[in-house]
From Swiss-Prot:
GO terms assigned for molecular function: oxidoreductase activity
Coiled coil: none
Family to which the UniProt record says this protein belongs: Belongs to the nitroreductase family. HadB/RutE subfamily.
Name of the protein described by the UniProt record: Putative NADH dehydrogenase/NAD(P)H nitroreductase XCV0587
Broad EC category: oxidoreductase
């Protein structure tokens, strides 16, 4: 493995990064969003399954489709954000495994009823959603992840007739510090972790 990141990089990714509630009126180009995915795709997932699917909602039409699914507290900031990413997962992800994991017959591990794949799709898709947040920060973007929305409405509007299910949303852009809440505390190591 390479050397540790310097303190400034760790600050940008973790210590001084904040969950944004407001963004500057600066668009995020499709090129930057493609660059973002090119980083996210390298994050590890079980059997290299990569079940996450991302919809980058940037247009007025896309935001109008999303609006009915948003909770009241999340609607205004989401509609104003330059980008809202629907982080979803494909419950038929195993169909891509002969290409993604050629070392073994990994597809056969997940053959059978879709319900048997749901847990793996959700778990590994969630990992990829976390990679998206960190990759966005690495590229100088700010992120505002949230789960205050109606999954069924999002699925009907964006994924009807597919095995893709929404997980959570992430607003992306260049953050406006005026929209930040005071920094909340975090659990200490001894509260959240232990050695065995």
């Amino acid at each position: 493995m390479s050397d540790s990141l310097n303190a400034a990089a760790l600050d940008q990714l973790f210590r001084t990064a904040r969950t944004q509630n407001a963004f500057a009126d600066t668009p995020v180009s499709h090129e930057v969003l493609r660059e973002l995915y090119e980083l996210v795709k390298w994050g590890p997932t079980a059997a290299n399954s990569g079940p996450a699917r991302f919809v980058f909602v940037t247009s007025a039409e896309g935001k109008a489709k999303l609006k009915p699914a948003l909770s009241e507290g999340n609607a205004a900031k989401t509609l104003a954000a330059p980008v809202t990413v629907i982080v979803a997962h494909d419950e038929d992800f195993h169909e891509k495994l002969p290409y993604l994991f050629p070392h073994a017959d990994a597809k056969s591990w997940f053959d059978g009823p879709r319900e048997g794949r749901t847990e793996s799709a959700f778990r590994n898709g969630s990992l990829q959603g976390a990679y998206l947040i960190l990759a966005a920060r690495a590229l100088g973007l700010d992120a505002g992840p949230m789960s205050g929305f109606d999954n069924a409405k999002v699925d009907a509007a964006f994924f009807a007739g597919t095995p893709i299910k929404s997980n959570f949303l992430v607003n992306l852009g260049y953050g406006d510090p005026a929209g930040l809440f005071p920094r909340s505390p975090r659990l200490s190591f001894d509260e959240a972790a232990r050695f065995e």
